Amino acid sequence: MRLIYFFVLMLLPLLAFSQEEAFYIQFTDEDIRDAFTKIEDKYNVLFSYKDEDLSKNRITIKREKRTLLEVLAAIKDVTGLNYKVLNNRYVIINQNSEKDVDFNALDKVVIRSYLTKGIKKNSDGSYNIQPVKLGILPGLTEPDVLESIQLLPGVLSPNETATSFFVRGGASDQNRLIWDGITIYHKGHLFGMISPLNPNVTSEIKFINKGAHARYGERLSSVIDVSSRTDISNETTAELGFNGISADALLDIPIIKDKLNIQASYRRSYMDVFETVTFNQLADKVFESTKIKDIENGNNDFLFSDYNVKLNYKPNKKNRLYASVISIENQLDYSVNDSENNTSYTDRLMTTNTGYGLGWSIDWSKKIAQTTTAFFSDYKLNYNFITKENNEQTSDFEKRNTIYDSGISSELRINVSENSNVTFGYQYTLKDVAYAFLNTTNLVFVLDTEDNIVQTHSLFGSYDYSNLELIDVSVGFRASYFEELDAVRLEPRLQVFKSIVKNLKFQATAEIKNQIISEIDETILSDLSLENRVWRLADGSAFPIINSQQVSSGFIYNKQGFSIDVDAYFKKLKNITALSLGFLNPESNNFNIGKQRVFGVDAFVKKRFNGFTSWLSYSFNRSKSNFDNLNDDRDFTSKSNVTHAVSSAVSYKLNGFQLALGWKWQTGKPYTISQQDGDGLVFNEGINTGELPNYHRLDFSSTYSFKFSEQNKLKGKVGFSVRNIYNRKNLISREYTGNNSLNDPIKLIEKYALGITPNLMFRVYW
């Protein structure tokens, strides 16, 4: 809190601003959204609007010295858009008259270009990311859905994967990933290095790390709610592209003008045909400390693919429907032949996630709207380790993990007044989760085969009050009944966003959440040492329902392209579980129940000037865990703890060129210190008492967008990026594992981050 007070005192002298001041300003065939961003910077205002109201408006205004009201009047003359200025600070834009403005439906943005163009922070604390509008980010040639999130304060991926990131000290399985209402369980392509979702078909991402709306349940740390394209175009459009890992295609075809269209996309790796430097670098990291890396004469066949198909139907102005399908698949087939001993070994691993979603939105009147969705998600992990001698199979270790997740949700939204609305709804989900380890009778450690079902009934409601001149408040409540567990959980939610003085806002949230599905480690069971986490359901006893309580508070300062965002938080988790072998307790392989406490501060500073955007973020995190019968019942540092993390970047845009340079630095992850004696490794200093060396890397990206000619609509984009420019050798993991038997010694496994990794991208649109 001292840090917050310090920033407030430093900023108070900067708060004076004359709204009547005039500036020279001009626009030449500029997108209206870009024009609004420039006006925000110059006149220290914030625009609120619905994207559909802006359509494809472009604007040209000659250079003149104008006040804010004069600029808005000129825009109205050119576009016909109406405006209303509130409190000399907020500008409401819409197509209708002022009397018809739906304030509840407007975009309540507090920082419009958070890291870069296309990332917005809203008054409820959530972030909106629109990949099609996303500016360049360091190290990325394309707007990867999940890697973009990792640049936000408080989000860290110490293992450098796209999917296994920590949000405010929470484990990666505490993040809920949703695609068109479908819960996704797949961990990503190339064992998490690449997002499972195609960014080129993604329309919008809503990321929530605190104070989630009452409609969101199931996970403790965050929600990543991803929507594919919802607009219905009257023209056929297509895209083709490739990068150093995969190629993809996208097609959007109108079927009935303004009413019905179909969108389809397909992405596939091409490593089975041609291996690039990019793939080899990623593969070196992924397969490090595995048989694939250790044995040189093995045959490794790996590929991934995903596709999406979506129908959008708008029969009239009041109704909108969609049907969406997504499929994600990874395959690995690795074999080794020992001709001298006439033996062979084969590892086969396949992970798939197929989902189906339906949605219907209807406006019953100007004040009442309803949204109903249904989904089914099918996740499968199949692993086989087959040994043959003299061409006859001698052993087959088999691992299975399946999830059948289905549900339906309906919510009603009522605009009570110009400034307030209420939402209430019902959700039903059925989760059927199973895991099995077959033909493993010779192993000392075997997890029991299990198949559990949990049905959940949830009622939720919220009251939202929004007055841009005074305060934004959201009070919500969620009540869930877990049928098979015969348990009820209550989850209050609160969000507050309040103006203190001009340009300075106070933000606060509080929430309680519960989680019934989580991942468990079984590293000792898989010779391949990949995908060593399996999903399982709570059973109310050995695996209780996990509970989280979080509060946060901070402030936001925003003036003329200069933004500061500081947020402090405290989070408490109960009933988390851990396999004691993971903490090096060979006498018992029981699951232990524990608790975790997290305190942290996230800070962000950004400045835009003359085509440049620069930002700096800092995160402090202190996370402690305590488990019964572990570490002598004493607290120890959580494995997700990264005490200090700093990210900084500068980007520049000029016409079609974009450049970005970014640097990351963070303290190392904790690890358990070991010593060598005559019997192997021993552990006498407690759990996670050591800390890995500091991590840092420098990334670069550049893109160029162009037209092939002025006579046709064919456009192109080319990009180049380099991760870890100075090829820093970062140690990111120091762990220990057995080898399928306690009679074998415990082994030390060290893993390193990516070395210097270039990537290329080329894309065409028409």
Regions found by a protein language model. Name each.
Residues 417-423, 427, 447-572, 615-619, ...:
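Structural signature of Gram-negative outer-membrane beta-barrels, strongest in the C-terminal barrel
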Residues 245-270, 287-331, 351-369, 416-422:
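Transmembrane beta-barrel wall of Gram-negative outer-membrane proteins
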Residues 271-277, 666-678, 704-766:
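C-terminal beta-signal and adjacent terminal beta-strands/loops
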Residues 36, 40-43, 79, 86-136, ...:
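Short, acidic, small-residue-rich periplasmic hinge/interaction motif at the N-terminus
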Residues 570-572, 591-675:
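Gram-negative outer-membrane beta-barrel transporters
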Residues 405-409, 448-460, 540-544, 550, ...:
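Outer membrane beta-barrel strand-and-loop segments of large Gram-negative receptors
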Residues 121-173, 181-200, 204-212, 229:
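Periplasmic N-terminal accessory/gating domains of Gram-negative outer-membrane beta-barrel systems
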Residues 380-382, 434-439, 483, 503-551, ...:
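Surface-exposed extracellular loop regions of Gram-negative outer-membrane beta-barrel proteins
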